Each structure stands twice: as structure tokens, then as C-alpha cells.
């Protein structure tokens, strides 16, 4: 018997898939075997005496039993002419096949089974086996395997089991037939009862239907009367409604005509509003142009006045310089004559001095000569006097002449001294001392009521003005200051902070050189809009302009809870890449510092632009004629 067949047999016995068999499993599989037979089979298969049959023990024991049977001459399955009994008598099988060995089992044909097959065992002629069971194929395979195993005792036990199982099936079949007969009789009785009930229900339904029809006729008649009355009322009401609708239609026609007229007026008003907006925008641009023209005109007027003052001053300086140059020329002529005479005297005295040179040298080494001391002292005093004289003379008057080598040192010292005096004035933000060299347009921006106008008043008038009116549109102011020794004109454009003037502010940003963005340290909402303002400035300008972020009203920080901290403002300025300063228009703290920082940034940016464009400011060409050149020629 092949191992797969034995494994299948073990799987059939091990219904719970435990991997081993117990005595209870054998009793379930073979309930017709007595305890002695079961114990004998269990002991034969349980080789190690563990009380359970392992799978390997079952396979080995069953295989050894089959081999033992084959060694006794029972190899293969011999199918004999068995007799099958049915109700009509003995019936012989039609197909009789003999298989000599187990190896031919894979190629043997299928067994043809007719209506019912009854196998008659040689060992027990008194038992008829009927294999017409639900699992007929499995039983036949198992029966063939038992026949081929060569264990007659086990085959007899299997035949008893199959016979008892067939007997139980027959009893169950008879019981099922009896129950079917009972069910058929009950069903017939139930059908008769249902027919009687249906007839009764039909009669009752007919009565109820007749009654319902009568009631429905009465109800419909009543409803028809009521509907007729209601229809008459509705007809009269509808006539009234029609008349009212006709009147309303006339009113609506008049109203529609009025609305059409209003629509035409609204369209015309919309066109007029658009034209008004265009005119307002043009007016704003004209105001901007006018303000710029005014600023330029004021700047030109200031430059003109300054030039006139400078021209008159230079005329006075020129006349004074001419007089000074004449006196200096005369003094130099006298000096040259004296120098010539000294040279002649020096030649005549050199011979006399040669004879006494050794004696005079020894005398000079021992004691200094009072004449030399006086000459040295006089030379120092003369140098200081000459230096003061050259400092008093304007440098441009002297520089117009070509100095000779003897006076070049004095001129260099004078230039260096005057340069030192000028360098000492190159610090801070001071009032202008002359015409403006440069002009910068600076736009004041920020939310409403943050102190922009007060900031401008502090810059222009050096005072705090309380209760200033709100700025409408833009206010224009000009302040000329001296920054690091340079006169600079600052045009301050004070814009309105309301949202409705935001588009007007953008037009000023396009022409601005710099911007001062002001927020109120006591109003956090104005600080939160700083980023939007900076983005608006950057979007409106064609190039990057210097911006300073100013936190105003720091004098009120201590009295205001939740004020914006200085570190927050500095962080915002660093993140946006702008300057930062906290100020107070009330006490004027850091106002000048903020303007100084922004002005220096504007000047630095303009210097870079001038260098990048290749513009070089050369000094004026020097005059080729002068008193020194004439003196040298003479």
C-alpha cells in the first residue's frame, strides 16, 4: 500500500488533526469493534507504549502489516465473483477485474457501479454489504485497500461497520418516508383549512367591499357638492384676483418704465463715475507733478539765491585776493632782490670765510652762537607767521598760480591744515551752510494715526505740534541739511495712511529715492501691517530704494500694555532687510538719528550709482598764468 494512501487513512482517522491517534479516535472510526479488538490494534500500532499512536508509528505499523500479509501469499487484490443480494434475488456483477499488485492501482479503470452494488464477503457469508451510501467512492476505495492489506479480521470488522451503517441508513430512510407521509397528510389538512378560511375571508371581503363602496359613493357625492360650492367660491375669488392682477400689471408696467429710466440713469451715472475716477486719477497725477514742480522750483529758487550770495561773496573774495596777490607779488619781488644781493655778498665773503673755517668750526662745536639761536627762533616764528598768512589767504586764489619750489612746502602745509579743519565738520546732521549739492525724495508711509505728520513737523520745525489734522492725499515739505560736510535737500512727502489713498501712495513710491515706514509701538495692528507696506513699496518701485522702519511713540510704551517690543521691530527689520530706529516725535528722541541714517544710506547708494555709470567729477581747470610764474620768469 502506498504511503499517500496510508496518510489519507491516517487523516480520516485523525478527524481533529491532532497529529496522533488515541483509543477514542479508533472507537469513533470503528464503533462496531469490541474493546479487545480495538486494544489489540492499538497495542500493535503503539510501539513505544506512550498511550497514543503517532503518525510515523501508524505508517510504519500499517506498512509492516501489509508487508506481512504479502509475505504470506496475499499480495495484490483479487476481486472475486461476489454475489449481491437485492429484494429480487442474487445478482452477479458484470465487470470482474483482477489486479495482481498495488503498483497497478494507478492504471486500473474505474469500477462501473450500477443502481446498487452488494459485495459478499468470503469470510462472512451471512453479511450482505450495500455500498450505496453518500460517500460510496471513498468506502469502495477503503474496502479495496483493506482487501489488499491481507488482514481478514480487519476486513470483517469493516464489513460489519458498513453493514450496520447501511442498516442505520435504511432505518433513517424508512423514518424519512414516514415523516413525509405525515407531512403530506398535514399539508392536505392545512390546505383544506386554508380553502375554508379563504372562502370565509372572500365572503367577508365582499360584504366589506359593498359597504365601502356605499360609503365611498356617499362620500364622493358629498365631496362633489362641497367641491361645487368651493369651485363657485374660487371662481368668484379668481375673478377678483384677475381684476386685481390687471390693476397690478398696469402698475408694474409703469414701475418697469420707471426702472428702465433708472437703469439708464444708473448706466449714465456709472459712465460718469468712471470718467470721474479717471479725472480724479489725472488730478492726483497733476497734483503730484505740480508738487514736484513746486519742489523743483523752490529748490531752483533756493539755489539761485544761494548762487547769488555765493557770487557776491566770491566777487568780494576775488577783489580781496587780487589785492593780496599784488602785495604778495611785491613782497616776493623784494625777497628775490634781497636773495640776489645775498648771493653776491655770499660770494665775496666765501673767500674770507675759507681762511677762518677751521677756527670757526671749532668755535661752533664748543658753544652755540647766539646768532644761530636767534635765527632758528626767528625762522620758526616766520614759518608760523607765513602759515597764518597763507591760511588767511583763500586757497583757490593761491592755487590758481603755479608755486615755485621754495613755497610748495608752505602751500602743502596750508592745504593740510585747512583739510583738517574741514574734516572736523564731517559729522552729524546740521543746518545747511550753503546750496544743496544733492536732492532726495523721501516718502513717509504707514497706517493712519501712527505719527507721520508729527515726525515731519519735528524734522522741519524742531517742535511737536499737537492735534494735527489727518493728512488727505499728500503734504510736501523741504528741509536742507548738512550731512558729513555736504548740503543735502530732503523732500519729505507725507502721505495719507487711510486705505482709500493707498493707490495714490503707489504713484509716489515710483518716484521716491527712499522711504520712512512708521508704525505705532502702542498699536500692534500697525506693526502687523509693516510687511504689507514693505511689499507694496518694493512692488511699486522699479529699483531697490533704502527704507528705514521707525517705531514711533516710544514715550508711551510704559503706559500701554501689550506694546510692540524693540526686539520685535529689530527682528522684522532684519528679516525684511531695512534699517530700524525707535523714535518719539513728542520729545524728539532719535529723530535726527533716523534722518541721518537714511540720508547717509541715500548718499552711499547715489555714490555707487555714479561710480557704476562712470561719471567722474573733475576739479576746475587751473589757470595757466599767475604771479608766481611771472616772478619766476623775471
UniProtKB/Swiss-Prot annotation:
Which residues are the signal sequence here? none
Q: Which PROSITE patterns match?
A: EF_HAND_1 (PS00018), EF_HAND_2 (PS50222), RAB (PS51419)
Q: Where in the cell is it found?
A: Cytoplasm, Perinuclear region
Q: What is its main location?
A: cytoplasm
What GO cellular component entries does it have? Answer: perinuclear region of cytoplasm
Q: What keyword terms does UniProt attach to this protein?
A: Calcium, Coiled coil, Cytoplasm, GTP-binding, Metal-binding, Nucleotide-binding, Repeat
Query: What molecular functions are annotated in GO for this chain?
Result: calcium ion binding; GTP binding; GTPase activity
Supply the InterPro entries for this chain. Answer: EF-hand-dom_pair, EF_Hand_1_Ca_BS, EF_hand_dom, P-loop_NTPase, Rab, Small_GTP-bd, Small_GTPase
Q: Which GO terms describe its biological process?
A: vesicle-mediated transport
Q: Where is the EF-hand domain?
A: 5-33, 33-68
- Which stretches of sequence are listed as region Disordered? 216-237, 308-328
Name the coiled-coil region(s).
Answer: 169-310
Q: What CDD domains does its record include?
A: EFh (cd00051), Rab (cd00154)
Binding locations of GTP = 449-454, 552-555, 585-586
Propeptide segment residues: 632-634
A UniProt-annotated Pfam family: EF-hand_7
- Which amino acid positions bind Ca(2+), per UniProt? 46, 48, 50, 52, 57
State its role: Binds GTP and GDP. Plays a role in uterine seam cell development.
Q: How does it assemble?
A: Homodimer.
Q: Please report which protein family the annotation says this sequence is part of.
A: Belongs to the small GTPase superfamily. Rab family.
- The protein depicted here goes by the name Ras and EF-hand domain-containing protein homolog
Origin species, per record, is Caenorhabditis briggsae
Amino acid at each position: 500500500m502506498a504511503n499517500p494512501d496510508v496518510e489519507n487513512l491516517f487523516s480520516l482517522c485523525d478527524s481533529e488533526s491532532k497529529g496522533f491517534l488515541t483509543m477514542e479516535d479508533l472507537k469513533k472510526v470503528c464503533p462496531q469493534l469490541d474493546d479487545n479488538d480495538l486494544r489489540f490494534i492499538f497495542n500493535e500500532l503503539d510501539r513505544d507504549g506512550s498511550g497514543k499512536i503517532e503518525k510515523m508509528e501508524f505508517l510504519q505499523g500499517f506498512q509492516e502489516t501489509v508487508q506481512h500479509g504479502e509475505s504470506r501469499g496475499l499480495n495484490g487484490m483479487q476481486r472475486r465473483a461476489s454475489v449481491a443480494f437485492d429484494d429480487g434475488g442474487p445478482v452477479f456483477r458484470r465487470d470482474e477485474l483482477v489486479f495482481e499488485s498495488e503498483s497497478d492501482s494507478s492504471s486500473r479503470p474505474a469500477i462501473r457501479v450500477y443502481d446498487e452494488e452488494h459485495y459478499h464477503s468470503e469470510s462472512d457469508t451471512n453479511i450482505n454489504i450495500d455500498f450505496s451510501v453518500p460517500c460510496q467512492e471513498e468506502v469502495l476505495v477503503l474496502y479495496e485497500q483493506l482487501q489488499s492489506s491481507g488482514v481478514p479480521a480487519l476486513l470483517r470488522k469493516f464489513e460489519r461497520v458498513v453493514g450496520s451503517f447501511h442498516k442505520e441508513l435504511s432505518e433513517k430512510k424508512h423514518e424519512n418516508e414516514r415523516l413525509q407521509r405525515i407531512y403530506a397528510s398535514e399539508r392536505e389538512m392545512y390546505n383544506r383549512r386554508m380553502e375554508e378560511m379563504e372562502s370565509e375571508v372572500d365572503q367577508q371581503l365582499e360584504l366589506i367591499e359593498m359597504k365601502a363602496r356605499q360609503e365611498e359613493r356617499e362620500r364622493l357625492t358629498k365631496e362633489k357638492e362641497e367641491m361645487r360650492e368651493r369651485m363657485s367660491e374660487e371662481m368668484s375669488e379668481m375673478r377678483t384676483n384677475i381684476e386685481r392682477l390687471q390693476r397690478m400689471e398696469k402698475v408694474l408696467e409703469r414701475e418697469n418704465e420707471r426702472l428702465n429710466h433708472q437703469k439708464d440713469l444708473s448706466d449714465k451715472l456709472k459712465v460718469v463715475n468712471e470718467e470721474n475716477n479717471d479725472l480724479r486719477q489725472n488730478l492726483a497725477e497733476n497734483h503730484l507733478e505740480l508738487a514736484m514742480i513746486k519742489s523743483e522750483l523752490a529748490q531752483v529758487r533756493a539755489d539761485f539765491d544761494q548762487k547769488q550770495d555765493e557770487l557776491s561773496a566770491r566777487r568780494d573774495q576775488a577783489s580781496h585776493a587780487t589785492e593780496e596777490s599784488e602785495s604778495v607779488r611785491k613782497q616776493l619781488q623784494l625777497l628775490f632782490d634781497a636773495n640776489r644781493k645775498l648771493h653776491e655778498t655770499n660770494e665775496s665773503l666765501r673767500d674770507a670765510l675759507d681762511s677762518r673755517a677751521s677756527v670757526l668750526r671749532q668755535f661752533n662745536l664748543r658753544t652755540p652762537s647766539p646768532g644761530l639761536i636767534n635765527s632758528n627762533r626767528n625762522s620758526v616764528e616766520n614759518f608760523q607767521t607765513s602759515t597764518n598768512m597763507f591760511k588767511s589767504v583763500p586757497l583757490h586764489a593761491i592755487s590758481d598760480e603755479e608755486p615755485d619750489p621754495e613755497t610748495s612746502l608752505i602751500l602743502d602745509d596750508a592745504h593740510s591744515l585747512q583739510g583738517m579743519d574741514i574734516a572736523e565738520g564731517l559729522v552729524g546732521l546740521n543746518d545747511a551752510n550753503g546750496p544743496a549739492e544733492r536732492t532726495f525724495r523721501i516718502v513717509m508711509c504707514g497706517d493712519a494715526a501712527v505719527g507721520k505728520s508729527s515726525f515731519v513737523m519735528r524734522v522741519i520745525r524742531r517742535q511737536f505740534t499737537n492735534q494735527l489734522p489727518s493728512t488727505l492725499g499728500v503734504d510736501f515739505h523741504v528741509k536742507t541739511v548738512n550731512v558729513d560736510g555736504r548740503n543735502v535737500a530732503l523732500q519729505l512727502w507725507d502721505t495719507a495712511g487711510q486705505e482709500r489713498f493707498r493707490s495714490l501712495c503707489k504713484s509716489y513710491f515710483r518716484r521716491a529715492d527712499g522711504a520712512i515706514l512708521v508704525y505705532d509701538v502702542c498699536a500692534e495692528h500697525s506693526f502687523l501691517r509693516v510687511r504689507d507696506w514693505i511689499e507694496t513699496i518694493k512692488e511699486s518701485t522699479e529699483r531697490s530704494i533704502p527704507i528705514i522702519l521707525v517705531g514711533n511713540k516710544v514715550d508711551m510704551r510704559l503706559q500701554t500694555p501689550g506694546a510692540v517690543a524693540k526686539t520685535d521691530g529689530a527682528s522684522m527689520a532684519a528679516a525684511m532687510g531695512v534699517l530700524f530706529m525707535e523714535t518719539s516725535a513728542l520729545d524728539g528722541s532719535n529723530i535726527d538719528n533716523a534722518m541721518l541714517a537714511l540720508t547717509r544710506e541715500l548718499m552711499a547708494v547715489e555714490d555707487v550709482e555714479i561710480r557704476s555709470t562712470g561719471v567722474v567729477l573733475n576739479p576746475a581747470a587751473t589757470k595757466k598764468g599767475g604771479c608766481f610764474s611771472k616772478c619766476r620768469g623775471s
